[in-house]
């Protein structure tokens, strides 16, 4: 896709980092294993998958790596993967054992805490938002991640409508990936603590699964009284962008965010209250109600991450903190040090760094063979806005300036000045 896109725009071709044959060969290497059972992953390496409490199928991985010295015990490593919070729908919380040499832990919410909420509290919060959007008179758009978040929303909406807490508002699920994921959730619902038999907890007469592009486009004619759940969750791709284009300019419409919005994404910009955004190359004024519901997170917060780490100690040789924005990584590192760890053994690895791990001593940093793929200051920018955001803002500012200019000569003068800067 990127190759074709560059060709259409007259840009240089992109050298692929792998071929289709290589991708298909990699897929043939996939083997299904059961959780909570040790497997021989390679000579001298055992692995075990345990429930991470994040989404259906998410797992932490325990490794035991045999020492080259026969008298030395195997090194024990734990990779957290994404860790789920306590009290999450469809989950009993993260599982696993303790007593490791090294722990690698995620830090998505390493610097913040959320208010704990029960199932009843979560549904009450969703009910308030849906009723407020319904009263406003427009459609309710919910950008949602296709796996787990969408199914949680459907489950809660079905339950609220079944008990009469919400009117049976038409709900449209407009995400091909979410449709496929929902069938998987239905197949394995017994693993979610839901009854194996009976009606699907994700379906009802007023829940409509949108399967074709034509059906999705038809939703653009809706003006009120509907809930549209579509991906992507951060509004960076998918069908939600078309629904935003159709509804953001309507003051009676509502956009409800139910998940994390990375800095620089359209979702984050809308939450910040920008007056306009660019979608599909067009400026769209933001008049819709922008709301957020922070009760569906799939990630443990600071308090829960520290509890997860504490329950898996000791980590004799070190802890690596990964997968987070700079503030989250630094915040969680400080908190882990406060637990009594030597700061030198609580490591926030940088891109392209390589470490050698030893069962009897601390991890050793090996200098990368080549220069980092990012410029010195670029890593700090990865989690924030990039030039694409600046470009979109510049285009919007230029359009506003041209519209506010009274006469044609003044507009042409402004454009000439800009062109001189570019030369």
Residue locations for each model-derived region?
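His/Asp/Glu-rich metal-coordinating catalytic cores
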Residues: 1-170, 191-194
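A short, flexible N-terminal coil/short beta segment enriched in small residues
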Residues: 49, 84-86, 163, 168-190, ...
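Active-site metal-binding loops of divalent metal-dependent hydrolases
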Residues: 55, 81-83, 107-108, 145-147, ...
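Short, compositionally biased "basic patch" segments
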Residues: 89-108, 179-180, 185-192, 261-286
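Glycine-rich phosphate-binding "P-loop"
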Residues: 107-123, 142, 201, 287-307
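Binuclear metal-ion centers of metallo-dependent hydrolases, dominated by the metallo-beta-lactamase
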Residues: 115-197, 315-376
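C-terminal regulatory/interaction regions
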Residues: 159-162, 207-423
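Long, charged amphipathic helices and adjacent flexible linkers at domain junctions
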Residues: 188-216
């Amino acid at each position: 896709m990127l190759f074709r896109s560059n060709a259409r725009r007259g840009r240089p071709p992109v050298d692929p980092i792998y071929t289709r044959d290589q991708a298909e060969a990699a897929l043939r290497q996939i083997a299904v294993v059961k959780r909570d059972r040790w497997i021989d992953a390679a000579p001298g390496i055992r692995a075990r998958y345990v429930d991470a409490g994040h989404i259906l199928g998410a797992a932490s991985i325990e490794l035991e790596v045999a020492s080259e010295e026969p008298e030395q015990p195997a090194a024990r490593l734990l990779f957290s993967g994404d860790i789920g919070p306590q009290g999450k729908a469809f989950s009993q919380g993260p599982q696993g054992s303790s007593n490791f040499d090294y722990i690698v832990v995620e830090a998505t919410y390493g610097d913040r805490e959320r208010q704990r909420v029960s199932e009843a509290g979560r549904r009450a919060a969703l009910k308030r938002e849906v009723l407020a959007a319904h009263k406003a008179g427009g459609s309710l758009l919910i950008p949602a991640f296709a796996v787990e978040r969408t199914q949680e929303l459907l489950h809660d909406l079905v339950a609220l409508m079944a008990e009469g807490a919400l009117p049976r508002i038409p709900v449209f699920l407009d995400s091909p990936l979410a449709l496929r994921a929902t069938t998987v959730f239905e197949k394995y619902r017994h693993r979610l603590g839901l009854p194996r038999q009976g009606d699907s907890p994700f379906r009802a007469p007023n829940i409509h699964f949108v399967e074709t592009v034509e059906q999705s486009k038809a939703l653009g004619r809706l003006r009120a009284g509907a809930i549209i759940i579509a991906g992507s969750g951060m509004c960076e791709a998918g069908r939600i962008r078309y629904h935003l284009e159709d509804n953001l300019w309507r003051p009676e419409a509502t956009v409800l965010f139910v998940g994390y919005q990375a800095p620089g994404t359209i979702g984050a910009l809308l939450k910040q209250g920008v007056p306009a955004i660019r979608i599909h190359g067009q400026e769209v004024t933001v008049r819709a109600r922008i709301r957020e519901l922070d009760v569906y997170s799939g990630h443990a917060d600071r308090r829960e991450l520290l509890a997860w780490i504490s329950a898996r100690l000791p980590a004799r040789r070190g802890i690596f903190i990964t997968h987070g924005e700079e503030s989250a990584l630094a915040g969680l590192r400080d908190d882990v040090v406060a637990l009594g760890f030597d700061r030198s053994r609580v490591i926030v690895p940088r891109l392209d760094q390589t470490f050698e791990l030893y069962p009897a001593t601390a991890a050793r940093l090996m200098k990368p063979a080549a220069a980092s793929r990012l410029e010195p200051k670029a890593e700090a920018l990865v989690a924030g806005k990039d030039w694409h955001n600046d470009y979109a803002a510049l285009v919007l500012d230029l359009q506003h300036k041209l519209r506010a200019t009274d006469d044609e000569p003044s507009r042409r003068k402004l454009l000439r000045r800009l062109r001189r800067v570019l030369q």
